[in-house]
């Protein structure tokens, strides 16, 4: 039980190097791993044949039920090669019937249900960590007991390599170049690498991220199936499940189509009646290369191995954020996500047609995400670039296509393999602290006492609307304002200034002194992950007033759901070309509510020093206050006026709407429970009706049988009544009273019956014993048959002795 299923215990026929020969030895396998590698889905379930298997729906049985679920056992032969490739799929395999013209001898991978031949191959089974959580029993919360990925270091196993792959790895380590040959004769990583390099040399535009997003897997492959490696290494599609509709021609959301994807499996896109006009994703390729999800999360291969076998065709981000230090390099020195680099394509357990688990993405860095969305290579661009047309000059400008900003916010799931809360919180706080260092101080001349103020304003500029950090800062600023002692009014004070401000203090200096006092008390370490989670939850709720900024509606569809991720990612993902933006002063200019004159003065003067927000526009911390991120400790001086009343009314309406939605959800749950109960009762009633119908049919058959029997008895009775029978003779005096014809009739009947009686008597005498007249006659030794066996033992034959016969007859 300790040996792997592969028999590769002997060396290859051509003596390989020592390192290769050592690896070719059969590695020990854990008993559970050995069981799955050898027996999982290789035999048909005997209970399913008897219609007794309880693990059919949902299908969690250890054995296969239908032929297209059958898995061939992967074996490494004595020559060091696998019995079928772990990477190249067979083009003749019928996924519906599970049949291949070459049968089990086919050297290519069969795309069985659940892709079990690839996932449970010696090359990939349990070689990567699962991205999903582990329950109390140690099983995967997503894939259950049969998860093909490891849940912990104790569950990991070393991959079994093909001899050609080992030779390619040794040649790569020795600095030798791999001899070019056919794709089928190369290892998985070497063949993919060679094919990608050839494609990039033929079409250099594949190195551009925007070109990949717009054209990857949108055109059919023109090469013969045997000459193309297929999968991720080829940017063209080979079947309907590999095809991707171009987002430039077709507008569809990032959510999977319910008619195509059932559970975790992607079915045939032809099952959707809408075809290419469907508004949802039909393949995994369409979902992972959707503009809302593409490059939104980090590549796990880059983080763990430092290389990715998919190269420019990877749907996940490869660029790490620049090192954060006091001496920041200029933005031009930071590489762009589209710049090609020396990438080593090593064999990986990544998916063949799509980059899936165990090459799962991890948490995206906030600064890297912002730089990616804005098209800049460094966070310094985010803070120092002025607003205007220059912000649109992005290397990812073509990633977002028209019509996507009208999608409903927060209505879709997140990308596969999204980050966990602890990772997001750590990265989020880390970038908050470092943005102040990265912020240049070249907006306008400042005194020596102001350098500390600018980074703190930058921190406020990058905080999302409704963030607990913003609320705490607003509370601190309000407290500082309230703690400032009133100053005597002067004659030179501006009409819009506070009456208590000193006349020789400029308005901007007054506001900056307040901000500096408030931010001195701010410690970013005091804010934990819980506060950030609340920030993300609050930022995902759309504002009921549907405020528009720059003419575009703040609506988007969030990426697909990721196990173990935050509840919402609307702050990180946006369908608009620009990154998420905070509410600008446009919201303050609504005709329903204007702030007081003194507050407008504060807002106007602070805007002159406006720090750049996430959208790159001049904005100040007062915009966060105006957008509804007030702290409970905010001074009433900032909440006075019709604008504050309007905000309070809108907030109340939002709370009421949320309460109504919760009530509707509860009502819907109750109605669903009642509907399920009614459905169950209806099913039970139907079963009872079926049983009653069967009983009724049986009773009807019994009734028909009884009626037939009664009918036969009646016919027999009628026949007996019509047949003339011997009648009992009346008494002698009565005979004289009868007519002569009646007497003749009685006489005739009696003669007939008498003849019948005589015949019966003669027949009985001829077969019965002459002595006892009960037993049947038997043949005596004298060959006479006149007595029975019992009587013949004690009497002599009456025929041989006539006197005896006469005596018997008398």
UniProtKB/Swiss-Prot annotation:
Compartmental location: Cytoplasm
Any one of the GO BP annotations: in utero embryonic development
Biased composition (Low complexity): 10-19
Region feature Disordered, mapped onto this chain: 1-24, 239-265, 478-497
Residues bearing PTM Phosphoserine: 240, 374, 378, 385, 394, 631
This protein's UniProt keywords: Coiled coil, Cytoplasm, Metal-binding, Phosphoprotein, Repeat, Repressor, RNA-binding, Translation regulation, Zinc, Zinc-finger
Pfam families listed in its UniProt record: zf-CCCH, zf-CCCH_11, zf-CCCH_UNK, zf-CCCH_UNK-like_4th, zf_CCCH_5
Zn-finger segments (C3H1-type): 84-113, 124-154, 215-241, 251-285, 293-321
Zinc finger (RING-type): 766-801
A cellular component term, taken from the record's GO annotations: cytoplasm
Coiled-coil annotated residue ranges, if any: 643-727
Gene3D superfamilies per UniProt: Zinc finger, CCCH-type
Residue ranges, compositional bias (Basic residues): 241-253
Key word Repressor present: yes
One Gene Ontology term of the molecular function aspect: zinc ion binding
Function: Sequence-specific RNA-binding protein which plays an important role in the establishment and maintenance of the early morphology of cortical neurons during embryonic development. Acts as a translation repressor and controls a translationally regulated cell morphology program to ensure proper structuring of the nervous system. Translational control depends on recognition of its binding element within target mRNAs which consists of a mandatory UAG trimer upstream of a U/A-rich motif. Associated with polysomes.
Family classification: Belongs to the unkempt family.
Protein name per the record: RING finger protein unkempt homolog
Gene assigned in the entry: Unk
């Amino acid at each position: 039980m300790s040996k792997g299923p592969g028999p590769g215990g002997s060396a290859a026929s051509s003596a390989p190097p020592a390192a290769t020969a050592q690896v070719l030895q059969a590695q020990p396998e854990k008993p559970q791993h050995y069981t799955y590698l050898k027996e999982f889905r290789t035999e048909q379930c005997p209970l399913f044949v008897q219609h007794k298997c309880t693990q059919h729906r949902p299908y969690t049985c250890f054995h296969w039920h239908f032929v297209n679920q059958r898995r061939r056992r992967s074996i490494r032969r004595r020559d060091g090669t696998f019995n079928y490739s772990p990477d190249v799929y067979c083009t003749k395999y019928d996924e519906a019937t599970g049949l291949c013209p070459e049968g089990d001898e086919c050297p290519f991978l069969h795309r069985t249900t659940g892709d079990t031949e690839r996932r449970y191959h010696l090359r990939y089974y349990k070689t990567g960590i699962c991205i999903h959580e582990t329950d109390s029993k140690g099983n995967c919360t997503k894939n259950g007991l049969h998860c093909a990925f490891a849940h912990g270091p104790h569950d990991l196993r070393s991959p079994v390599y093909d001899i050609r792959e080992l030779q390619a790895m040794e040649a790569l380590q020795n600095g030798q170049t791999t001899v070019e040959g056919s794709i089928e004769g190369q290892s998985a990583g070497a063949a993919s690498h060679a094919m990608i390099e050839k494609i990039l040399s033929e079409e250099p535009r594949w190195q551009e991220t925007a070109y990949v997003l717009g054209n990857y897997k949108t055109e059919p492959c023109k090469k013969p199936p045997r000459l193309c490696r297929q999968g991720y290494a080829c940017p063209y599609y080979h079947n309907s499940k590999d095809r991707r509709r171009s987002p430039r021609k077709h507008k569809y959301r990032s959510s999977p189509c319910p008619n195509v994807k059932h559970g975790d499996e992607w079915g045939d896109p032809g099952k959707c009646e809408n075809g290419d006009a469907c508004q949802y994703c039909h393949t995994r390729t369409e979902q992972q290369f959707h503009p809302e999800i593409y490059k939104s999360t980090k590549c796990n291969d880059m983080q763990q191995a430092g290389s990715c076998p998919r190269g420019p065709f990877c749907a996940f981000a490869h660029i790490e954020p620049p090192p954060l230090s006091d001496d920041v390099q200029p933005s031009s020195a930071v590489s762009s996500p589209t710049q090609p680099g020396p990438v080593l394509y090593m064999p990986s357990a990544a998916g063949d047609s799509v980059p899936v688990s165990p090459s799962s993405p991890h948490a995206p860095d906030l600064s890297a995400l912002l730089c990616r969305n804005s098209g800049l290579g460094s966070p310094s661009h985010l803070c120092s670039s002025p607003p205007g047309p220059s912000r649109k000059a992005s290397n990812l400008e073509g990633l977002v296509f028209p019509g996507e900003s009208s999608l409903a916010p927060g209505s879709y799931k997140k990308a596969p393999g999204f980050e966990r809360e602890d990772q997001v919180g750590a990265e989020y706080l880390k970038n908050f602290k470092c943005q102040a260092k990265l912020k240049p101080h070249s907006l306008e001349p400042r005194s020596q006492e102001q350098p500390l103020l600018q980074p703190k304003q930058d921190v406020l500029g990058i905080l999302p609307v409704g963030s607990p950090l913003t609320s705490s800062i607003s509370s601190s600023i309000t407290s500082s304002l309230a703690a400032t002692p009133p100053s005597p009014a002067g004659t030179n004070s501006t009409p819009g200034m506070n009456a208590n401000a000193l006349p020789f203090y400029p308005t901007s200096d007054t506001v900056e002194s307040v901000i500096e006092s408030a931010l001195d008390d701010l410690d970013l370490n005091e804010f934990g992950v819980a506060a950030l989670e609340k920030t993300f939850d609050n930022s995902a709720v759309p504002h009921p007033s549907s405020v528009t900024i720059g003419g575009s509606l703040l609506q988007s569809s969030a990426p697909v759901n990721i196990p173990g991720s935050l509840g919402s990612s609307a702050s990180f993902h946006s369908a608009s070309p620009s990154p998420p933006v905070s509410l600008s002063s446009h919201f303050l200019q609504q005709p329903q509510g204007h702030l007081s004159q003194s507050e407008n003065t504060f807002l106007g003067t602070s805007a002159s020093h406006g720090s750049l927000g996430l959208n790159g526009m001049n904005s100040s911390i007062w915009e966060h206050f105006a957008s509804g991120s007030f702290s409970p400790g905010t001074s009433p001086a900032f909440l006075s006026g019709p604008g504050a009343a309007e905000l309070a009314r809108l907030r109340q309406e939002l709370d009421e709407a949320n309460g109504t939605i919760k009530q509707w959800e509860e009502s819907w749950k109750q109605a669903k429970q009642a509907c399920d109960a009614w459905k169950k009762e209806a099913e039970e009633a139907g079963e009872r009706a079926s049983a009653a119908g069967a009983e009724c049919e049986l009773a009807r058959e019994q009734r028909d049988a009884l009626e037939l029997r009664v009918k036969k008895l009646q016919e027999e009775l009628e026949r007996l009544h019509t047949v003339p029978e011997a009648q009992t003779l009346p008494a002698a005096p009565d005979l004289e009273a009868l007519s002569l014809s009646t007497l003749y009739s009685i006489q005739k009947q009696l003669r007939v019956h008498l003849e019948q009686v005589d015949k019966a008597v003669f027949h009985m005498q001829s077969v019965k014993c002459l002595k006892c007249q009960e037993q049947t006659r038997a043949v005596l030794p004298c060959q006479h048959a006149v007595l029975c066996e019992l009587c013949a033992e004690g009497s002599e034959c009456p025929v041989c002795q006539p006197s005896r016969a006469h005596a018997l007859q008398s």
